[in-house]
Amino acid sequence: MLRRSGTVRCPGAWEAVHGHVEAGETPVAAAVRELGEETGFTAERLYNLSRMEAFYLHRTDQVALIPVFAAVIDPAALVVLSGEHDGWRWLPLAKAGQELAWPRERRSLEDVAILLGSGGAGPLEDVLRVF
């Protein structure tokens, strides 16, 4: 989990890696890029959680559609935070769900527990695993 720094909106909120898709970029490429930018991590495996979150941006009158991914990383990888965050911590899924500020991220953790709790996606591996 990452804690938002005092220099961005929602300071102090705990969240998962997230971001936006840049022009000409695929959602998968954006997920990999954001993971690297926000944590310094490289995904060993990436899963499509088969979930699409939507929310309304009232300030710009836009609807955002967000595909949700889960990354498996090397447990020995070192965290390198961007200026967007000033803290991080590893938590068990149940505890992380209590700490995350955004309800959509809590819902995604339920999918992670169900789909990847055994270390892989089981019979869905060939469908959900991106790489």
Located regions from the model:
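N-terminal strand-loop-strand
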Residues: M1-E15
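Short loop segments at secondary-structure junctions
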Residues: S5-G6, V72-A77, L93-K95
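Short active-site-proximal "capping" loops at secondary-structure junctions
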Residues: G6-V8, R51-A54
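The catalytic Nudix box helix
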Residues: A16-L49
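NUDIX/MutT-family hydrolases
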Residues: V68, V79-V112
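Short, charged, intrinsically disordered terminal tails
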Residues: G117-V130
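Active-site-adjacent beta-strand/loop module that shapes the phosphate/pyrophosphate-binding cleft
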Residues: M52-L78, R89
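Short connector loops at helix/strand junctions that flank enzyme active sites
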Residues: P11, A16, Y47, Q62-I66
